[in-house]
Amino acid sequence: MDKIQKAKSISIWIFLIPFISVNTCLILITEFQWIFPNQEDIIHNTIPYFDGGASISRTVRPYPSWLIFKPAMFLTSFLLIKYWFYCKDIIISFNKDHKHIKKIIFFGVGSAIALTIHSIFLGIKFDNDLYKLFRRVIMLLFIIFEITAQAYLVSTLYSFKTKLDKYINQKILKMKLILVSTLIIVAIICIPIISWPGDNFKFLKHLLEWDYFLGVITFYLLTFFMWNKKV
């Protein structure tokens, strides 16, 4: 099936582009401080996946980091929209009346739109509490919509998984189920921590942010390996 191959090929880029761009920005701001005009922007000696030494926003927001990150996120948003429509076509080919098709498109495309809006405002400094709240809400919507779309997709594939034996690696599908379930549980548990005002648990918040980001995009890496049989 042509749509399966397209979804497979596009999924690896949805993983690689954000992963490479955010970690490139991290390396630049920690190891190549001289390229940053404002030396207050630089970060020293941190591996935020383990120590939570800086947030993703703090890493990618300063110039020239955003010159890398913004285009990468715009491209990722575009690829996400294409990916979710490919998934829609795949589902229709197996069950054209499946009840989750519209939900998958709504939340999948919605997550891409939220990511685009967040990227547009990234790097724009505006000292206003309402503006800061707006950015946080948009980022929260991206996470909620993305995880919801992933959950509906995995649930849908499971509903006719016997029909997919010819096309899919069932072990990877189970891994995706475990991943999405973990992301949902972690999100529910960590909402009180993330929502806590001030700098309390700051490093834990940052650590969770980086690792959660990695978990969300790993879904697409697993997608690449899931459709690993010739179709």
Summary of predicted features, one role per range:
Residues 80-110:
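Cytoplasmic juxtamembrane regions at transmembrane-helix boundaries
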Residues 111-169:
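Membrane-proximal helix-loop-helix units in multi-pass membrane proteins
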Residues 51-76:
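Interfacial helix-start motif at the membrane-water boundary
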Residues 18-39:
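Alpha-helical transmembrane segments of multi-pass membrane proteins
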Residues 2-22, 102, 168-179:
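Alpha-helical transmembrane segments and their helix-start/interface "positive-inside/aromatic belt" motifs
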Residues 151-231:
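Terminal transmembrane helical module of multi-pass membrane proteins
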Residues 104-114, 183-191:
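Membrane-embedded alpha-helical bundles of multi-pass transporters/translocases
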